[in-house]
Amino acid sequence: MGTLSVNQNKLQKRLRRLAGEAITDFNMIEDGDKVMVCLSGGKDSYTMLDILLYLQKVAPIRFEIVAVNMDQKQPGFPEHVLPEYLKSIGVEYHIVEKDTYSVVKEKIPEGKTTCSLCSRLRRGTLYTFADEIGATKMALGHHRDDILETFFLNMFYGGTLKAMPPKLLADDGRNVVIRPLAYCSEKDIEAYSQLKEFPIIPCNLCGSQENLQRQVVKEMLLEWERKSPGRTEIMFRALQNVVPSQLADRNLFDFASLRIDESATPRFLDVMNL
């Protein structure tokens, strides 16, 4: 890649700045951390690795980066692509082999969504491997749009008000998951991926499942953004400004104990000046 144009330079600086802000805001990476960067071969994880490698050079703290890819034994998976790329940029890496493809195909009927089971199997394997290599943080490539899509998926189809947190302590208590691209838009990541010419590997399991609920939500959000530019950013900001007293979850706010405050100053209506 040659010299960047003005717009390309702005794009790179914006992604680096937003990732740095997210890392700082949520204290994602600390001095001495060993960060396991989960690399799928998609645009998001390539971009995350690229940005983390840059931040590693300029950050005031020291931390290790180890790239990890999980070979799920999907038919036609180009096993040489990631090792060649990671060797070319001088990054320590591991390839974890686990035939989750066969398990998913056996358990999920033809035509049904494989994403949920596939992600659970992959997550469990990666948690175990992170523990084995002594990783203190596990970095995933989810971006702002992923977080918003998950929010609406849970609300529309699950009846819960939750999304993907930028930082998460796993249920096992032994893994801390971080999402450095939490503030970054998919549009910017797509443009950056094309700019950097990452060797993208498509997913044979879920890449062709056009009728997924997530795809429906994604198209809804894209349409909203087309009609009202900036709406996506505003909605994400809302996830950072939660007011439990204005919702209806009794576990988050004690509605039952609300009483009139007898010591409060009374309000008098001046009927003469109405």
UniProtKB/Swiss-Prot annotation:
Signal sequence residues: none
Motif (PP-loop motif): 40-45
Family the entry assigns: Belongs to the TtcA family.
InterPro entries reported in the protein's UniProt record: Rossmann-like_a/b/a_fold, TilS/TtcA_N, tRNA_Cyd_32_2_STrfase, tRNA_thiolation_TtcA_Ctu1
Amino-acid positions noted as binding [4Fe-4S] cluster in the UniProt annotation, renumbered to this chain: 115, 118, 206
Function: Catalyzes the ATP-dependent 2-thiolation of cytidine in position 32 of tRNA, to form 2-thiocytidine (s(2)C32). The sulfur atoms are provided by the cysteine/cysteine desulfurase (IscS) system.
Family annotation (Pfam families): ATP_bind_3 (PF01171)
Enzyme class at the top of the EC tree: transferase
Entry's EC annotation: 2.8.1.-
GO cellular component, one term: cytoplasm
Biological pathway: tRNA modification
Xref: CDD domains: TtcA-like
Protein name: tRNA-cytidine(32) 2-sulfurtransferase
Subunit note: Homodimer.
Anything else known: The thiolation reaction likely consists of two steps: a first activation step by ATP to form an adenylated intermediate of the target base of tRNA, and a second nucleophilic substitution step of the sulfur (S) atom supplied by the hydrosulfide attached to the Fe-S cluster.
GO biological process, one term: tRNA thio-modification
UniProt keywords, alphabetically: 4Fe-4S, ATP-binding, Cytoplasm, Iron, Iron-sulfur, Magnesium, Metal-binding, Nucleotide-binding, RNA-binding, Transferase, tRNA processing, tRNA-binding
Cofactor binding annotation: Binds 1 [4Fe-4S] cluster per subunit. The cluster is chelated by three Cys residues, the fourth Fe has a free coordination site that may bind a sulfur atom transferred from the persulfide of IscS.
PANTHER family referenced in this protein's UniProt entry, alphabetically: AMINOTRAN_5 DOMAIN-CONTAINING PROTEIN (PTHR43686:SF1), SULFURTRANSFERASE-RELATED (PTHR43686)
Location relative to the cell: Cytoplasm
